Amino acid sequence: MAAAVPGAVSLSPLLSVLLGLLLLSAPHGASGLHTKGALPLDTVTFYKVIPKSKFVLVKFDTQYPYGEKQDEFKRLAENSASSDDLLVAEVGISDYGDKLNMELSEKYKLDKESYPVFYLFRDGDFENPVPYSGAVKVGAIQRWLKGQGVYLGMPGCLPAYDALAGQFIEASSREARQAILKQGQDGLSGVKETDKKWASQYLKIMGKILDQGEDFPASELARISKLIENKMSEGKKEELQRSLNILTAFRKKGAEKEEL
């Protein structure tokens, strides 16, 4: 073991504190502070990473974002673990100093007054990302992603019934839809007791579409989205959020309209 340097013992605690402060104040990579569940990208890694996932949701924002919208993004990024097809990423942009990632800002004609800006890249297509222009709320973005064909394990949603909902909405005849509804009804016996309430809601929506037509999911989404803005208990609000999540399964893939 090397001999101790005179004075080193007394200086160690001070040096440790100073080093800790320096680490805390130093920028964490080119995109600013890292968000758990989101991959920070720059002008080099952006072009390497996007083609490697079927879906990549990229948030373009200031280098050091904060506030309510950033908190929503943090929740979204952590929840993205439920999807095997989706990668959540973020690009921090600065138009002063080193002007970080301005090349990407110019490429996608981003307005810093509109940050955060979200784009969904599909199958490595850099030129035609799908923009998101809805509310920066976890539930709203998740429902929009689901409408774009990204599977997310959202509260209230059941994978088997999500699949049936997709088949139902794409079916071209009333007879085919009735057959899918019956398939869902027959499958209820195999659903866990705790999930039967939500499975039944899928079936109820199918019945409403058969009775009232194609516009039912959209009108019901609008109705519940407006209702949820009212003052109510957290339990009731959570239940309505689950209903919104289930309704999203009945949107055709690629639908551009976002929910509130």
Swiss-Prot record:
Tissue-specificity statement: Ubiquitous. Mostly expressed in secretory tissues.
Signal peptide: 1-32
Keyword Phosphoprotein part of the UniProt annotation: yes
InterPro entries attached to this UniProt entry: ERp29, ERp29_C, ERp29_C_sf, ERp29_N, Thioredoxin-like_sf
Cross-referenced Gene3D superfamilies: Endoplasmic reticulum resident protein 29, C-terminal domain (1.20.1150.12), Glutaredoxin (3.40.30.10)
Record-linked PANTHER family: ENDOPLASMIC RETICULUM PROTEIN ERP29 (PTHR12211), ENDOPLASMIC RETICULUM RESIDENT PROTEIN 29 (PTHR12211:SF0)
Any one Gene Ontology cellular component term annotated for this protein: endoplasmic reticulum
Biological processes per GO annotation: intracellular protein transport; negative regulation of gene expression; negative regulation of protein secretion; positive regulation of gene expression; positive regulation of MAPK cascade; protein folding; protein secretion; regulation of endoplasmic reticulum stress-induced intrinsic apoptotic signaling pathway
Keywords: Endoplasmic reticulum, Phosphoprotein, Signal, Stress response
Modified sites of kind Phosphotyrosine: Y64, Y66
Superkingdom to which the source organism belongs: Eukaryota
Name assigned to this protein: Endoplasmic reticulum resident protein 29
Triggers of expression: By stress.
Cellular localisation: Endoplasmic reticulum lumen; Melanosome
Oligomeric form and interacting partners: Homodimer. Part of a large chaperone multiprotein complex comprising CABP1, DNAJB11, HSP90B1, HSPA5, HYOU, PDIA2, PDIA4, PPIB, SDF2L1, UGGT1 and very small amounts of ERP29, but not, or at very low levels, CALR nor CANX.
Placement of sequence motif Prevents secretion from ER: 257-260
CDD domains on file: ERp29c (cd00238), PDI_a_ERp29_N (cd03007)
GO molecular function, one term: protein-folding chaperone binding
PROSITE patterns: ER_TARGET (PS00014)
Entry function: Does not seem to be a disulfide isomerase. Plays an important role in the processing of secretory proteins within the endoplasmic reticulum (ER), possibly by participating in the folding of proteins in the ER.
